[in-house]
């Protein structure tokens, strides 16, 4: 599922990949061919929309695009399922417009839940079984819960205290990464972060240097993403994912959490389980991401100045941040991105996560760090637009 969704997201480009370099960001119909409905939106929002469709219906690219997965693919060709998808987008838009004043109350996921055709009859095991564990995207302050300040203060104190955190101005990290199954194994990861809002994650694949690197970069104003083995390759983030990249960079320095997220509210505590790692993990890599560990967490949600929702999950016992889910935008619903944090270790008086699982609708990257250095000089070029990939 993850492999299919990722391919669906990143391989539908038929226009020129160099569009990202334009001063004025190009829209979906300028980069992709035969776009009939999802016009006028940034490329990253368009790709997020493809991810929602894949996840909601359990599809991969080949379900809608003729020849996907082969060298004879015709991305622009109209197929019955692509035509139906356009009808569904129009239908969902009309439902929300006519009944909810345009708010996105109904999405593909509302009905499909991973099925091609929505279920129409309730299963008794669901009627009389445990209730749904799915949380609302937008949370409200629940009475009787500790204040957001108390939860955040406990977290900051646990990882080193505000004074030490205020002194954290940069860090670099090295380790290994395992991606989604179709990527053919793991790579070496480097992370560069500079206060207050610059971050670059670089994953290279020494066993397959021809494929190029996987990159996520935010320089404080602009962001780029590059995924190997795709037609689109490197592209600039200008839609909802731009704010997501900014938030990831800012939260690399936890001392500014209350400046980054405002209107903090606390929901009910919940029990969460670790997200399984990528299917490509081998037995000797499986320890990189714990699976099946349950923990009770305090749930705090805030909003960025640009309106992006972010939900933070703090371990109720230790106070550590163990998960962050942020929501991008698309014409047919919010696009979730989840980062799980574990294996906190002390580095110069500050506890930092050495294990991270970065998951989006198109795949998962499991990262295990082996080395972190704080307050080291970082070349500004690390946060610049990436050079053309070796694979393109």
Set out the residue ranges of the language-model regions.
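The canonical Cys-X-X-Cys-His
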Residues: 58-68, 105-115
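Bacterial N-terminal signal peptides
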Residues: 2-13
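N-terminal mature ectodomain segment of secretory-pathway/periplasmic proteins
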Residues: 157-231, 263-277
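Acidic/charged, solvent-exposed loop-and-adjacent secondary-structure segments enriched in E/D, K/R, S/T
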Residues: 224-256
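Mature N-terminal segment immediately following signal peptide/propeptide cleavage
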Residues: 25-66, 148-168, 172-175
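Gly/Gly-Pro-rich "capping" loops immediately C-terminal to redox-active cysteine motifs
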Residues: 40, 69-94, 120-134
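Gly/Pro-enriched, hydrophobic low-complexity segments
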Residues: 209-212, 292-389
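N-terminal cleavable signal peptides for secretion/export
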Residues: 129-188, 388-392
